[in-house]
Amino acid sequence: MSNWTTYPQKNLTQAEQLAQLIKEADALVVGIGAGMSAADGFTYIGPRFETAFPDFIAKYQFLDMLQASLFDFEDWQEYWAFQSRFVALNYLDQPVGQSYLDLKEILETKDYHIITTNADNAFWVAGYDPHNIFHIQGEYGLWQCSQHCHQQTYKDDTVIRQMIAEQKNMKVPGQLIPHCPECEAPFEINKRNEEKGMVEDADFHAQKARYEAFLSEHKEGKVLYLEIGVGHTTPQFIKHPFWKRVSENPNALFVTLNHKHYRIPLSIRRQSLELTEHIAQLISATKTIYQKS
């Protein structure tokens, strides 16, 4: 790894090292998971969850919002009572995250592409170029046929607001349940299901094609695979592909921003760096150093 002049350097702070590696990189492939939004305060546990869903917690003893969002509700009226509030909280009304703004200022100076397992609004509200983002797990603001009868997504924020306003006893009025125009099955949120997968429409495939083209263009050279807030729930989307590409490019570097330690394959440990400081604080400090250098 001698081709990276700033790796490794133990005399640097984590922010100093990250800033220098970004500056030195020919290109960045950035994988972003739930930990980055959580670092900005958009957590799925605690008061944020408990304030929005006290009735659902009382009925089902949910431990967190992720568990609740994946629950098999008793009917579509209850499903949409929960999901409408969930969509408003995590998509329509979620404010901008400072770490996303800070990261954008850094990335705009580089050749980069982002893949994310997040389905919230974080990139849109922060003003990212959509052509540089691949939402591989779907988006909370979109709907799909619950039977996956055709590959098209839909959107109607007004109906979501109406569901929230008119729901009673954890049920939305039956007439507000959206239905597929092709097979008349109820709509559901466009989010990948472990068993069923998800609807992947033309826009999804366009996002995927742009991402894959970027990867093809940067198989060689100093490519920084930067993983931010990615756990081990769905490693097949970011973590494992990053490992593979780093192993195939002796000039690539794998850098993780995460307060947790995850096992890194022995084969790429000499090309890896773990940064464990608070994600939002580390990105902010990195931006300051990067812009001064």
Swiss-Prot record:
Annotated Zn(2+) binding sites: 145, 149, 180, 183
Xref: SUPFAM superfamilies: DHS-like NAD/FAD-binding domain
Top-rank EC class of the record's enzyme: transferase
Gene Ontology MF terms in the entry: NAD+ binding; NAD+-protein mono-ADP-ribosyltransferase activity; NAD+-protein-aspartate ADP-ribosyltransferase activity; nucleotidyltransferase activity; zinc ion binding
Free-text comment on the cofactor: Binds 1 zinc ion per subunit.
EC number annotated for this UniProt entry: 2.4.2.-
Alphabetical UniProt keywords: Glycosyltransferase, Metal-binding, NAD, Nucleotidyltransferase, Transferase, Zinc
InterPro entries cross-referenced by the UniProt entry: DHS-like_NAD/FAD-binding_dom (IPR029035), Sirtuin_cat_small_dom_sf (IPR026591), Ssirtuin_cat_dom (IPR026590)
Catalytic activity: L-aspartyl-[protein] + NAD(+) = 4-O-(ADP-D-ribosyl)-L-aspartyl-[protein] + nicotinamide
Cofactor(s) the record lists: Zn(2+)
Positions annotated to bind NAD(+): 34, 117-120, 137, 232-234, 258, 262, 279
Result when mutating residue 192 to A: Dramatic decrease in catalytic activity
Deacetylase sirtuin-type domain boundaries: 8-292
Record carries keyword Nucleotidyltransferase: yes
Note: The SirTM-mediated ADP-ribosylation can be specifically reversed by the Macro domain-containing protein encoded by the same operon (SpyM50868).
UniProt function note: Catalyzes specifically the mono-ADP-ribosylation of GcvH-L (SpyM50867). This activity is dependent on prior lipoylation of the target protein. May be involved in the modulation of the response to host-derived oxidative stress. In contrast to other sirtuin classes, lacks protein deacylase activity, being unable to catalyze debiotinylation, deacetylation and desuccinylation of proteins.
Family classification: Belongs to the sirtuin family. Class M subfamily.
Protein's name according to its UniProt entry: Protein ADP-ribosyltransferase
Provenance organism: Streptococcus pyogenes serotype M5 (strain Manfredo)
